[in-house]
Amino acid sequence: MNANVPSDANCRRIICDGEYATVRYVGNVPPTPGLWLGVEWDNHLRGKHNGTHEGTKYFTCSHPTGGSFIRLKKANFGVDFLAALRKRYGLKSEQNEELVIGKKTVELVGFESIQEEQSKLNKLKDVSLRECAVSNAGEKGQICHSCPNIMTADLSKNLFSSWESLAHISSQLENLTSLDLSENKLNPSSNPSSLATSFCNLKVLSLNRTGMKWNEILQCASMWPALEELHLVSNDISLLEQPVNNLQNLTILDISNNKIVDGNQLHTIAFLPRLKQVIVSNNIISSISFPDVDFGHTAMFISLTSLAVNGNNISEWCVINELHKLLHLESLNCHGNPLMDLDKNPETVRQLIIAKIENLKFLNKTEIFPTERRGAELDYRKMFGNEWLKAGGSQNEEFNKPSRDFLQDHPRYSALIKKYGAPDEGELKQQQPFALKNQLLTLTIQCPEKPDKKPIQKKLPDSMTVQKVKGLLYRLLKVPGSDLKLSYQSSKMEGKEIELENDLKPLQFYSVENGDCLLVRW
């Protein structure tokens, strides 16, 4: 083999004319003389064939036009870690240093610059070597000697091809806790547990767009005994398996932008004891359920406080009912699901979700203040009051026996009655339709005690309750979690201020009219 070819060239990653590829063959390709590299391109449009040339199969590609042959001189096999570090951070590699002859020290040219460079390298804690063609650790021991204080390293989109080559780097960085390896194509290790000491302090790992499937992650997981945060975005993952004796310290898992269809796949990770945050946005999930209990709290995800399901296919309220079973769920992000469009008024959807999930404190990254929760729960209790009565509910506790179907559709309704009391008949007779009226009032919103806040004009339905108006104003005015006091001045009764004291009454109850001024105090 040509002396210029790396001994481990096969399966190595290269760059050629700005395109990334993996070497699949090293050797002759008759009748053309000379050495050739058979490569599989990341961009299959760059290739010409599937590894077969003039009837002879030299290598295999995952795409029928993903392969081609190139000359050795066109392949860049990358640089070592320190070379890339010096280049990225503007440091020169000097070879001159002190020379000791007997007992006499001779200072060679460039020694001061070496000391200065070494000082700069020693201070580095967070480094980014993205797209720097890094492929190896370089000379043994040089990394720990030059930059031992690195804690966070971005090595995304480089030329690493094996976990062993990465272990040679990380084993020299004892303080390394966060590592980004996104967009590297890594071959599986034959003995991953033997590399655990090299990654023993690693807490955050990103493997986005690496093509690694979940089963491959589990095969590698013994390498990361202390891992707390794992990012696997855009890896075409469709199936999950239950981790056994690994990933037990995981607190954050990001599997967004994958191809998970069945929400029950999440059951496989439901018993990771420390898992607090799951991000499963932009998959194809339409349902999530926790069948271990019909009502009450599930034994799954016992530590989960935050869930993101943005951009999925969730369209049924039963999914929200299921999420109520998560005892510690405090934050939910669910934008971009069909459910959010079921009612044209996003405020109504928000109120329903808040009422259905008891411990929720943030919805779509917006804080839920106590007054908003109270209003949402009271509105929910009133909105479905007639349905509750028809299903066997009663203001008389002795006869209050709503059907199982009703309780499955509204699992929190009984708790809301215990909290606020049953809705009376008068309340239910005055119940407004589910959809808001078309009668909109143009109101000027003023904060008389906050002169720095400019008046705002807003169109509100006259059927909107005072409580819902308060919820809107909390977000609109970015008011801290204190009680709002609302009143209004009629355009027909100048100087007279009327207090809106009952949160459950609509604006029309107080005869608020078009052009009136809404006064907000806190």
From Swiss-Prot:
It is found in: Cytoplasm; Cytoplasm, Cytoskeleton. Residues 337-379 form the LRRCT domain. It comes from the Eukaryota. Residues 27-71 form the CAP-Gly domain. One of its GO terms (cellular component) is cytoplasm. LRR repeats lie at residues 149-170, 175-196, 201-222, 226-248, 249-270, 274-295, 303-324. It holds the Pfam family CAP_GLY. SMART domains: CAP_GLY, LRR_SD22. Keywords: Chaperone, Cytoplasm, Cytoskeleton, Leucine-rich repeat, Repeat. The keyword Ribonucleoprotein does not apply. GO terms for biological process: cytoskeleton organization; post-chaperonin tubulin folding pathway. Its main location: cytoplasm. Belongs to the TBCE family. Supercomplex made of cofactors A to E. Cofactors A and D function by capturing and stabilizing tubulin in a quasi-native conformation. Cofactor E binds to the cofactor D-tubulin complex; interaction with cofactor C then causes the release of tubulin polypeptides that are committed to the native state. Tubulin-folding protein; involved in the second step of the tubulin folding pathway. This is Tubulin-specific chaperone E. The lineage of its organism: Eukaryota, Metazoa, Chordata, Craniata, Vertebrata. The gene is tbce.
